[in-house]
Amino acid sequence: MSLDTTEKQQLINTHQTHGTDTGSAEVQVAMLSERINRLSGHLQNNIHDFSSRQGLLKMIGRRKRLLNYMRSKSEQRYSETISKLGIRG
């Protein structure tokens, strides 16, 4: 359910805003979205894994807060990020 180093680097490269960017809101939302997608798949197979479900809800809340922050700072960055990640259809 965690991301490998190569997968993290791939996400960083596709969502970074400049060459050394590893922690911007866009990168954090992309990593959280990937972890959420993986954990959702795990929970479909393991319905009674309640501790993982709790972690999933925490990650969703963290992503929601980051997206609200992005929307307050720049509506354009927010729109580009959610369309690129395919969240909130």
From Swiss-Prot:
- Which intervals carry biased composition (Polar residues)? 8-25
- Gene Ontology molecular function: rRNA binding; structural constituent of ribosome
What PROSITE patterns would the database entry show?
RIBOSOMAL_S15
Recorded protein name is Small ribosomal subunit protein uS15
Q: Which organism is it from?
A: Synechococcus sp. (strain CC9902)
Function, in words? One of the primary rRNA binding proteins, it binds directly to 16S rRNA where it helps nucleate assembly of the platform of the 30S subunit by binding and bridging several RNA helices of the 16S rRNA.
Give one GO biological process term. translation
Q: Which domain of life is it from?
A: Bacteria
Q: Which Gene3D superfamilies match?
A: 6.10.250.3130, S15/NS1, RNA-binding (1.10.287.10)
Q: Name one Pfam family in it.
A: Ribosomal_S15
Q: Describe, as the record does, how this protein assembles with itself and its partners.
A: Part of the 30S ribosomal subunit. Forms a bridge to the 50S subunit in the 70S ribosome, contacting the 23S rRNA.
Region described as Disordered: spans on this chain: 1-25
